[in-house]
Design a protein with these regions (language model features):
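Signature of uroporphyrinogen-III synthase
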Residues: 16, 30, 76, 82-86, ...
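Class I SAM-dependent methyltransferase SAM-binding "motif I" and its flanking Rossmann-like core
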Residues: 107-182, 227, 377-383, 443
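A short alpha->loop->secondary-structure connector
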Residues: 122-126, 148-150, 204-210, 345-353, ...
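Conserved anion/nucleotide-ligand pocket segment
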Residues: 167-214
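Short, well-ordered beta-strand core segments
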Residues: 47-49, 69, 147, 186, ...
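Class I S-adenosyl-L-methionine
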Residues: 2-4, 10-32, 37-134, 139, ...
Length: 524
């Protein structure tokens, strides 16, 4: 058994001297939360990950950093890699002894050409496994509030493709008469471009022209759009609205239930696109909160955490821990980095000495509490002035003539140590990390920003703003896309103003919760 970098057990890796294995994994319909646990575990162990156009790009971050990522997208006649070449590539990578994950939208065996790929692997003697995924044929209707079966309406449903093999010409393997006469719901995949012909065939074969029709575009994602009409009107509506693929079409009386059962598109941030610029490991925290509320989240980390350039102060601080009366942590990164160094030299938390601990913000406090450390002081306002005020107003604690260790970023505002010194403290400002530029875009979020813009760009620190500006040009990005800026607090706002940007909103309180509340309020 091998444990991957996320701590997951990878039972299926094989020694590199032997042939590898190919996993045909269903990525689900688009919502990353609908990926199966088995699928997530396999992505986390992949040496090679080949993914389709309809796979949510955010799933790529589950792969090891060392994994080879191959885009194998197919849209109509535009294939990044022709199917035959892709089949051979899967065989080749497996024969190199690699663990290969072929990530396919929906389910591999539901109009996903997974059968063809599995046949090729079987003929080549390459071990393979099929990992089913949730098909858009049921998931997209569900997210639109349309049940494909309902005791009061129908007890069956039929799924067909609206895009048969081109070489069939006008020939069709679909029995349209039987389909039209059946009482069940009709679900059509890949049928947007041919919706007029599909509707005409159903009507020609006796299906009532007033039969309700629903079309769900980008189902289960925050880009979801739903169009409803009847067999007689749907094709004209598609043309009028410019409704494009990918979409699932549902034909039947159950479509009328959408008016009562719609839920996904009613979430408070639905339809808003929000850019999150935190570090790659932290972006998911804010991103997940926003996604749950319906936002289309683009995770574009602009910084990553690295060791401080000069570690002498850190070494001295660790060796002199027993001399401090207070340890002050201003961010979750500060906690993580400090204790990473601490546990390299000490085995026992009691080696911190008899100090008290101050934490700035609930996220910082949560990191410390996870280590079973008591927070002695946490200011109501998460700023330098707030920390100083908390000490100044405290009836229990005085820091006059006390030694205070301040563990934070290498580049940080001098205001906090100055405020603490004004209260008589002897302050050691100890850098435990630095922020450096992050330029990698594994999930395609930068391209999506360029193509479709954003409603909001969020900044959680001065460094995220400065590095975003250095990489993209903040003012130019805002002017191009008409986006608004959300700042977590005063220090970040100061940095933004220096860059020529006035935030539309500053979070109150200055925390992730405050940022979420601010976006909710702005959405109305």
């Amino acid at each position: 058994m091998i444990i991957d970098r996320a701590g997951r057990a990878c039972f299926n890796r094989r020694p590199m001297a032997t042939i590898g294995c190919v996993y045909l994994v269903g990525a689900g319909p688009g919502d990353p939360g609908l990926l199966t646990r088995r699928g997530a575990d396999l992505i986390g162990c992949a040496d090679v990950l080949a993914y389709d156009a309809l796979c949510n790009p955010s799933l790529l971050k589950l792969a090891p950093e060392s994994a080879e990522i191959i885009y194998a997208g197919k849209r109509a006649a535009d294939h990044a890699i022709p199917q035959g070449e892709l089949n051979q590539l899967l065989v080749q990578k497996a024969c190199e002894g690699k663990t290969v994950v072929r990530l396919k939208g929906g389910d591999p065996f539901v109009f996903g050409r997974g059968g063809e790929e599995a046949e090729e692997l079987a003929e080549a003697g390459v071990p393979f496994e099929i990992v089913p995924g949730i098909s858009s044929s049921v998931a997209a209707p569900a997210y639109a509030g349309i049940p494909v079966t309902h005791r009061d309406h129908c007890s069956s449903y039929t799924v067909i493709t609206g895009h048969e093999r081109p070489e069939k010409g006008n020939e069709s393997s679909i029995n349209w008469k039987q389909l039209a006469e059946s009482d069940g719901t009709k679900v059509i995949l890949m049928g947007v471009e041919r919706i007029r012909g599909i509707a005409e065939r159903l009507m020609e074969n006796g299906l009532d022209v007033e039969t309700p029709v629903g079309m769900v575009r980008w189902g289960t994602t925050c880009r979801q759009e739903t169009l409803t009409g009847t067999l007689e009107t749907i094709a004209d509506l598609v043309e009028q609205k410019g409704f494009k693929a990918p979409a699932v079409t549902i034909v039947g009386g159950v479509v009328d239930l959408r008016e009562q059962l719609s839920w996904f598109e009613r979430r408070p941030l639905f339809g808003r696109r929000v850019v999150v610029t935190r570090t790659r490991t932290q972006a998911s925290v804010l991103g997940a909160r926003l996604s749950e509320l319906g936002a289309d989240v683009l995770e574009i980390p602009t910084i990553k955490i690295a060791e401080p350039e000069d570690q002498e102060a850190l070494r001295d601080g660790l060796l002199g821990l027993g001399s401090y009366q207070w340890l002050v942590f201003t961010s979750p990164n500060g906690v993580d980095c400090f204790f990473n160094y601490f546990f390299k030299g000490f085995d026992d938390l009691r080696d911190l000495g008899g100090c008290r601990i101050a934490a700035v913000g609930p996220a910082t406090a949560a990191k410390l509490k996870a280590l079973h450390l008591k927070i002695d002081l946490m200011p109501d306002c998460y700023t330098a002035e707030g920390v100083a005020a908390a000490f100044r107003d405290s009836e229990e604690y005085s820091i006059e003539n006390e030694n205070v260790a301040l563990f934070r970023a290498q580049v940080a505002s001098p205001e906090l140590p100055r405020e603490l010194e004004s209260l008589g403290a002897i302050v050691d400002d100890i850098p435990v990390y630095q922020t450096v530029s992050e330029t990698e875009d594994r999930n395609g979020a930068v391209a999506r920003l360029e193509e479709g813009g954003a409603d909001w760009i969020t900044f959680t620190s001065s460094s995220t703003a400065e590095h975003f500006d250095a990489r993209f040009g903040l003012v130019a990005t805002l002017e191009k896309h008409g986006a608004r800026v959300l700042s977590i607090g005063p220090e970040t706002t100061k940095a933004l103003k220096k860059l020529g940007v006035e935030p539309a909103v500053e979070a109150q309180p200055h925390s992730i919760d405050g940022m979420v509340e601010a976006l909710m309020a702005a959405a109305g």
